[in-house]
């Protein structure tokens, strides 16, 4: 764009400072670009006007057609300067159109497929459409499709071989039915994820009055779905658990933890791996879930991930992994599994002072847990030889947080009789060993 062209200030969105493509008016009377104000209100979860700081009482956005036409005319007049005319935006979907679409979908499988494809298109257009879909109870509609489809291909008849059926025709029909159900499930799951459902709607899905247990359904998908659907299932499960009540989290079934660990093992996608770790962070503060997670092989999996440079190179991954290890090592089964892994002590010790303050604090807590409750002569010698004791002494010398220093000092004092006079502690660190 030529620098000599001056853009009228009222053409610019107060948030993005770019020319508005779809100007809309909020309840305070200020005009913004639709995409920017939707992101501010819905993704940012703010309820105030960025310009006036007044509370936005109504989230309905009124299109400013006059300003939009004025911007389009200005763009046309200045086309010779390389300014492109902004297209006329599509109007947001209305609730009646959504309800009609859902009603028509119940008439046949083909209409259901068409409905899901249309919903995907609607979701991709703008955030207002997403809120309209939510108001029309589309999340519940999609969850029911997913649940019913999963029940179909998980039904007992799905395990029958063709020899158990009356003839080959029946076998082919059954196979087609399962393929159709899986295809519907994959499409509905994708739309449900991209809908970016609000916290209120997520809670409604968790407490579905129609009896659909979405958590169980997503667990089954993580077990048997295609890679993309397994990833979406993990992402949705994380969102659901973030708004779940403590009792709902405590009552989670053992199978869920096994599938979460499998997601971590398969490394389906960066987002799926991150969500699986977040699920463990959300669920493992409760004792029952710690036992389930340990039985599912969580500790071994996390140690292996921490040894993987691709995973551990991201600070947040290392932090979450160490938080989960800390929680699991607070139970006896967790400490036993931790010590059963030959590289556990070395891997955890290596993360101290190398990633972040959170990682260092949690790593020291893990070492304190095993050092306090599982201190055998061989373990204490291993910690000496691996440089754990020297690392703990170093923690006392550097700036790394008072909590971390307190835990390190506690562990060093606990085994001072064995460690204090050891030649494995470098002389430059010896003076920091607590008395």
Curated annotation (Swiss-Prot):
One of its GO terms (cellular component) is cytosol. It is found in: Cytoplasm. It catalyses: S-ubiquitinyl-[E2 ubiquitin-conjugating enzyme]-L-cysteine + [acceptor protein]-L-lysine = [E2 ubiquitin-conjugating enzyme]-L-cysteine + N(6)-ubiquitinyl-[acceptor protein]-L-lysine. Residues 6-81 form the U-box domain. This is E3 ubiquitin-protein ligase PUB22. GO terms for biological process: defense response; protein autoubiquitination; protein ubiquitination; respiratory burst involved in defense response; response to water deprivation. Disruption phenotype: Increased tolerance to drought stress. Its main location: cytoplasm. Keywords: Cytoplasm, Plant defense, Transferase, Ubl conjugation, Ubl conjugation pathway. GO terms for molecular function: ubiquitin protein ligase activity; ubiquitin-protein transferase activity. Induction: By cold, drought and salt stresses, bacterial elicitor flg22, and bacterial and oomycete pathogens. PANTHER family: E3 UBIQUITIN-PROTEIN LIGASE PUB22, WDSAM1 PROTEIN. E3 ubiquitin-protein ligase that negatively regulates water stress response. May control in coordination with PUB23 a drought signaling pathway by ubiquitinating cytosolic RPN12a. Acts as a negative regulator of the immunity triggered by the pathogen-associated molecular patterns (PAMPs), in association with PUB23 and PUB24. Regulates EXO70B2 ubiquitination and degradation via the 26S proteasome to attenuate PAMP-induced signaling. It comes from Arabidopsis thaliana (Mouse-ear cress). Its EC number is 2.3.2.27. Gene3D superfamilies: Leucine-rich Repeat Variant (1.25.10.10), Zinc/RING finger domain, C3HC4 (zinc finger) (3.30.40.10). Interacts with RPN12A. Binds to EXO70B2. It holds the Pfam family U-box. Pathway: Protein modification; protein ubiquitination.
């Amino acid at each position: 764009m030529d620098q000599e062209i001056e853009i009228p200030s009222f053409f610019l969105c107060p948030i993005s400072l770019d020319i508005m493509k779809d100007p809309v008016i909020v309840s305070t009377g200020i005009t913004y670009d639709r995409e920017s104000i939707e992101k501010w209100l819905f993704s940012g979860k703010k309820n105030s006007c960025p310009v006036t700081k007044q509370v936005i009482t109504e989230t309905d956005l009124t299109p400013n057609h006059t300003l939009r036409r004025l911007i389009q005319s200005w763009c046309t007049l200045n086309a010779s300067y390389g300014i492109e005319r902004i297209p006329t935006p599509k109007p947001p979907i209305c609730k009646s159109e959504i309800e009609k679409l859902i009603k028509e979908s119940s008439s046949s499988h083909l209409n259901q497929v068409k409905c899901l494809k249309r919903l995907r298109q609607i979701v991709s257009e703008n955030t207002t459409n997403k809120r309209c879909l939510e108001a029309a109870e589309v999340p519940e509609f999609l969850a029911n499709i997913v649940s019913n489809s999963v029940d179909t291909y998980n039904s007992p008849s799905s395990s029958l071989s063709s020899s158990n059926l009356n003839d080959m025709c029946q076998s082919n029909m059954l196979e087609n039915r399962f393929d159709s159900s899986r295809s519907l499930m994959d499409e509905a799951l994708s739309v449900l994820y991209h809908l970016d459902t609000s916290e209120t709607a997520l809670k409604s899905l968790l407490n579905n009055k129609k009896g659909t247990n979405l958590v169980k359904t997503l667990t089954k998908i993580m077990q048997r779905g295609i890679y993309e659907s397994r990833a979406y299932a993990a992402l949705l499960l994380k969102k659901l658990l973030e708004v779940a009540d403590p009792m709902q989290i405590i009552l989670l079934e053992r199978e869920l933890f096994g599938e979460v660990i499998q997601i971590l093992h398969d490394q389906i996608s960066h987002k799926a791996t991150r969500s699986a770790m977040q699920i463990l962070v959300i669920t493992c503060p409760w004792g029952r879930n710690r036992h389930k997670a340990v039985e599912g092989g969580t500790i071994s999996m996390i140690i292996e991930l921490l040894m993987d440079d691709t995973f551990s190179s991201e600070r947040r991954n290392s932090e979450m992994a160490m938080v989960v290890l800390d929680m699991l090592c607070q139970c006896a089964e967790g400490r036993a599994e931790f010590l059963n892994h030959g590289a556990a002590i070395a891997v955890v010790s290596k993360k101290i002072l190398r990633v972040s303050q959170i990682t260092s604090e949690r790593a020291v807590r893990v070492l304190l847990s095993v050092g306090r409750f599982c201190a055998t002569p061989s373990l204490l010698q291993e910690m000496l030889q691996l440089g754990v004791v020297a690392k703990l002494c170093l923690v006392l010398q550097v700036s790394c947080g008072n909590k971390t220093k307190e835990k390190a000092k506690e562990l060093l004092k606990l085994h001072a009789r064995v460690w204090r006079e050891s030649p494995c502690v470098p002389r430059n660190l010896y003076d920091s060993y607590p008395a």
